């Protein structure tokens, strides 16, 4: 009976009153949607297109082995993938083919022949990027507007002067106040990016002589990425609980292991090294050198003398 009475009450409501009621409710809902703060979407960074390595700058035997001769350029991600999937065992250790065909230093070969494959010091898939990077070599020259320019670390001034003489770049006299400023065309930027794997830092196609000099200095600098590093003192291994191997008078550990061990001493909230770590390394790292992980790695290690094997 009660349900029937409710129905009678509902039926007695006029169409005008019902319309007013729903209109008010809808307006409230719209107001709530408008005033509600929507969570801001993170700005998605445009992914930079991956640089293609010219085929002639990749180790010829590697190119031939995987049939890459006709490629217009080889993505470094493809090289990484081919290295990881063809030169490592199922448990992620470098196999015998990799030891023969990839670019290893004499020291690395000696260490691999000394330690057991099960050792955490053995080269594994965490070292793929280093091994893949060694398969590409730096360009020694580039061509532009019918001219050939040679890249030599101790002759960068001559290179810049030659570019100016050939009018491949032009002096911008209006902008040249504290430093000589040059107009560098897009076509030359593309050539440099393709052959040297990075672009010079320009603004509106203008670059200073200092920046251009620094650019050529960086691209002609030899890549010295190491898998193994020499510790300055055996006590460092004890402080950081590192696995090591002794070769002659030197104590080696893996660069990645040392980096990870130091990174673990960084406080996740303050982003600074733990005080106890400061105390432990005080003898080896000066206070003004505790800038970041890579700087501390430099302070705890001896520069390696790299002699590459299997290079072409």
From Swiss-Prot:
Cellular component GO terms held in the UniProt record: virion component
Induction: Expressed in the intermediate phase of the viral replicative cycle.
Gene Ontology MF term list: DNA binding
Paired cysteines (S-S): none
Superkingdom, natural source: Viruses
Subcellular location: Virion
Keywords carried by this UniProt record: DNA-binding, Virion
Note: Each virion contains approximately 670 molecules of OPG077/I1.
Family, similarity comment: Belongs to the orthopoxvirus OPG077 family.
Function comment: DNA-binding protein which binds to the hairpin form of the viral telomeric sequence. Required for the production of mature virions (MV).
Name under which the protein is recorded: Telomere-binding protein OPG077
Species name: Vaccinia virus (strain Western Reserve) (VACV)
Record gene name: OPG077
């Amino acid at each position: 009976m009660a349900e029937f009475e409710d129905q009678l009450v509902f039926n007695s409501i006029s169409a005008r009153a019902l319309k007013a009621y729903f209109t008010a409710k809808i307006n409230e809902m719209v107001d709530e949607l408008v005033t509600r703060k929507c969570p801001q979407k993170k700005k998605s960074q445009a992914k930079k297109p991956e640089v293609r390595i010219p085929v002639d700058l990749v180790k010829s035997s590697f190119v031939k082995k995987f049939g890459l001769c006709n490629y217009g350029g080889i993505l470094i991600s493809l090289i990484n993938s081919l290295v990881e999937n063809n030169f490592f065992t199922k448990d992620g250790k470098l196999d015998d083919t990799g030891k023969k065909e990839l670019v290893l230093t004499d020291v690395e070969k000696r260490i691999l022949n000394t330690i057991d494959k099960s050792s955490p010091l053995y080269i594994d898939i965490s070292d793929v990027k280093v091994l893949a990077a060694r398969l590409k070599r730096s360009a020694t020259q580039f061509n532009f507007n019918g001219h050939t320019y040679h890249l030599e670390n101790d002759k960068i001034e001559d290179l810049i002067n030659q570019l100016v003489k050939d009018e491949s770049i032009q002096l911008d006299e209006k902008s040249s106040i504290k430093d000589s400023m040059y107009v560098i065309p897009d076509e030359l930027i593309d050539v440099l990016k393709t052959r040297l794997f990075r672009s010079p830092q320009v603004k509106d196609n203008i670059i200073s002589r200092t920046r251009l000099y620094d650019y050529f200095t960086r691209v002609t600098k030899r890549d010295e990425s190491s898998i193994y590093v020499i510790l300055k003192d055996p006590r460092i291994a004890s402080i950081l609980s590192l696995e090591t191997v002794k070769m002659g008078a030197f104590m080696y550990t893996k660069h990645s292991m040392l980096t990870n061990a130091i990174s673990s001493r960084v406080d996740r909230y303050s982003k600074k090294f733990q005080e106890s770590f400061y105390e432990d390394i005080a003898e080896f790292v000066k206070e003004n050198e505790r800038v970041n992980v890579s700087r501390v790695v430099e302070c705890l290690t001896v520069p390696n003398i790299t002699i590459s094997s299997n290079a072409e």
